[in-house]
Amino acid sequence: MLFKKSKAIIAAALSAAVVSNVMVATVASAAGTRTKPEAFGEDTYAERFLSLYDDVVTNGVENGYLSKNGSSSSAFGIPFHAVEEVIIEAPDYGHETTSEAMSYLVWVAAMRDNIAKNMTDQVDEGDLQYTADLAKAWATMENMIPTVQDNFWGGQVSAQYCGEYDNPEDCPDLHAADANKTASNPIHSYFTQAYSGQKGLYLMHWLADVENWYGFGSGTDFTFINTFQRGEQESCWETVPHPCIEERKYGNPQRGMKGIFNRDTEVAMQYAYTNAPDAEDRAIQAVYDANRWGVGDSNVSAKAAMMGDELRNNMFDKYYQTIGESTSWTNGNAGYDSAHYLMNWYTSWGGALASSGQNWVWQIGCSHAHEFYQNPLAAFALIQDADLKSGMKAQDAVKDYTTSLERQMEFYLWLQSNDGPIAGGATNSYKGRYEAYPSGVSTFYGMMYTEHPVYADPGSNHWIGNQVWAVQRLAELYYWVKTEGNTTGVKPGGMELDAALEQILDKWCAWFVNNSVLTDDGDFYIPSNLNWSGQPDKWGGSATDNTGLTCTITGYGNTDFGCVASLANTLIYYAKAKGVESSAIAGKTYDCIGSTAKAGIVDGVTGGSGGTAIKAGDAQLGEASLYLAQQLMDRVWAIGRDDIGLTRTDHNGSLARFFSQPVHVPSSYTGTMPNGDTIASGATFLSLRSMYESQSNCKGVQTTQEAIDLVAELKAAYEKDVAAGASWSGNNSASSDAGKAELADFTNVGAVELQYHRFWHAGDALMALGTFAELYPEMVPTTGSEVGPTDPTDDVDPNGLLGDVNVDGKVTISDVLLLNKNLMAGETLTAQGAFNADVDQDGTPTSADALNILKYTIMIITSFPV
């Protein structure tokens, strides 16, 4: 592999911060410096997939990705959100897991089976065996399906109305459950009739404490927990973690933990779960892929079909009210008039524990739908794949998914901005309280446009991951429709399915090709954050240009490898569906990408490449997409490959909230966490999680010393910033101008180096590598000569300054850059420059010399020759 170690460090040294609360790269001491041999080599994309999979899954327990919990001969260990513990995103602790992580495990296992069975000709190293990992991964994922669902099939489910909160401080005093407003799920009986032999819903709860760090469970056992409860302004930093099974063992003796969120003087012993349907859909997508690749498992397909069938619970309004612009309350339910047919943010369900002597159960849907939770590919799979279609046993499943496929596609057509990226979503319940819609707001089948559905701290549609996750599914669906056909009969917006997909993808891919950056030193940048302006046109049955809906790039990044890989995956499927051959990208260079990239957002990125912007419909768009995909994946591998996976040093100024974020606890409530931490008014994020600071505060699994040391380092940095005048008020969203300004002052916190190995990052990287191997088996990773050209006509002074590659009389980072360009891009060196570059004096300037010159510039070494 060309110049891997030095290129990684050089690229990292050149990168710079975008904004203080967005993670960005810096000098990496470990990233990109793999010392172990690759288990299956790295000369093909199949080999790279297998070598990375060997690190992340096969040896996942040893390398820290997987827990020992759950591991057996028929299942993998349960994946953590990340190898590292100090990471605050949607999980508030890195060794929690999510339904998202579980679904990625299923997806990568399906691809592993595919490569092991069908691509042995692409693998020359290692002992490749077919191990039927799909079934093992699905068995692992089933840990996220709750087994405690007492009486859920036997009871009459109710949905008692409670308005959503504008701010966490409003809970629970401002709104309470209203017994006079009670609804019910209109399709609950469908599932009781079809699946009464099951313990309850075959859906995943979204979050679990893998080794019982919080202590709500037993020992170090896997334990279901929850966090978010209190409306759109409740960030992860403002949550109170609590168990899904409430037995009043913790918190308050009479009110348990749930008493924080309601007004009950004595909380009943109960269970409660919430799903995140994009995870179930990703697992179904994986099974569909496996069936297409000939590595499916009939038992897994049957379970995926049942899961998909029951995922129709996510097609309904929160309280089963009519979808429309002037919804008024109706007790009972509005039947299918309450179905929006989109994938909403969640369905939640629960009931009394049998030990309580009570037998009530409840369920709610969700009125809010976000663009990035949609998965038309999963809907297509459930009605197009024979095994999945026949496996859905409940009434009207195929009918509902046919409608849902068309509705989801129309949702994307409606939300696509004039620029290309997809805007936020829609709701049937303004402010979560069925209030009157604002005047002039755009609507979609009676639902109002929402710029940032569900969450506002930070706004839920700023992050670029929403774009690449959502549109990957569209690109893959486009490929399957083009190659295998479509018998669903749907016509979104009056268009054939492939035409609708093409319209969305052409515009979206052109935007990313024009706004991504490939640098001549081997680095890259993609848009990382977007701001939104305007709204879509009112949906009238067909797509419009949405000239009043635009987005603006507010940040570029190069550390979010999961997003980068998902973008690459999208572009690969798009190019293949467009009929692009690998030979079409021969001779392309990095400056064909990024013609309209904005200047000044990233240091060293001066703006567009100067080329002509590629437009939707241009013949070269597919070629540029494939080229960009390959460059991104090859550069990620070169920059980020280390001994356990892929990573790049990050920074995150928003970690200042670790030590300053107040967490609302009602004045009427006092209690204790399992480890004795006090729950009362005045609590902070850290006061409820003192396990981050001391192992003696742990009741379940102990925090590692490495994590404790990192928190101490962050705290010392925070205290320096506070002494210099920095302050986090706790009153602003991190994505608001005021919030950004406050966090920008925490420069010392933002300077702390963070190294992350997120499981989903590895999952997206694996899928992009596997997709290359599947769709373009003839393509191999780009390589280059270890020796660059020189001009032999120059005279050489044998006493020249070693390290001075540009012959300007000093040794600086510019010399590293020039040698890097020489080795990677063929830029000519003078003969004197080549002599000076050979700092180990072995006769040839190589990547080892570039690395040593870099070490000299940052004073790791102090003299030459080396």
Enumerate the language-model features and the residues they cover.
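Cellulosome-associated attachment modules in secreted, modular CAZymes
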Residues: 25-29, 786-866
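Short glycine/serine- and small hydrophobic-enriched flexible loop segments
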Residues: 106-117, 285-293, 380-384, 472-483, ...
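Bacterial N-terminal signal peptides that target proteins for export
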Residues: 2-13
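General structural concept
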Residues: 89-149, 153-176, 264-292, 298-301
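N-terminal module-boundary/linker segments of secreted carbohydrate-active enzymes
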Residues: 30-136, 294, 298-306, 359-368, ...
